[in-house]
Amino acid sequence: MIPKSSSALHRTAKFQIIGLAFFAQNLCGQILISRWDFNSGSLSPQAGLGEALLVGGTAATFAAGYEGEAAGGWNIRNFPAQGRLPGTAGVQFNLSTEGYSSVGLSFQIRHSNTSANSERVLWSVDGQQFTEATRFSITPASTGTGESWYQRSVDLPLAAANQANLSVRIVSDFDLGTEGQYLASRLGSSYSTSGTWRFDNVNFSAVPEPEEYAALSALALLGFGLWRRRRSGANRGTSATTETSAFR
């Protein structure tokens, strides 16, 4: 086997260094820390650690997901009666954000025609006292608002970072334009407790803290160093064999 030239080895090393730099640069941005896609028909996260559960007396089944998976969506029903218990019923996700800052949440949600048009996103660090992070509301229309999927993104408050027990709820709420009343997601429909919300692709992302970033970078550098040593040793052995053959 013809050994690689010194320039070829340098080019290989250069590409590896560029790749390492790209990896390190990516670590400066948000990375996925927990994900639920429900494709397995269970509430276990598909990435990272965490817990998904129902709150406020809701019930659930699995139904078609955002991309059409047969059981890829978490379908929620049994919401409060009209005019009662706003901001209490829906779903909750528990996870740790220790070692991370700039926590973000994204998810897809499908509103049935008779479901509440308004969602509140709440967060807590003790699972008891919840604070509103944001709210989303659909303006009902006769077509296109009910039985439709929506993409949601939330930047959680700074205090949600570096928490051992972060809880986030997505719950139904009264419509802001109708005093003390839920409003159906489709114009012409009436709000019903049997209306459903369906969740898919619930993702939590965050930025590693400097200590976490340093540890990941050190591991990457260590791996690169070991690779260089092994490549160097292999090339020395190949060169020696080739040179000996040349003198015969």
Language model segments and positions:
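Surface-exposed, low-complexity/disordered Ser/Thr/Gly/Pro/Asn-rich loops and linkers
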Residues: 53-99
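A short, hydrophobic C-terminal helix/tail in secreted or cell-surface proteins
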Residues: 209-227
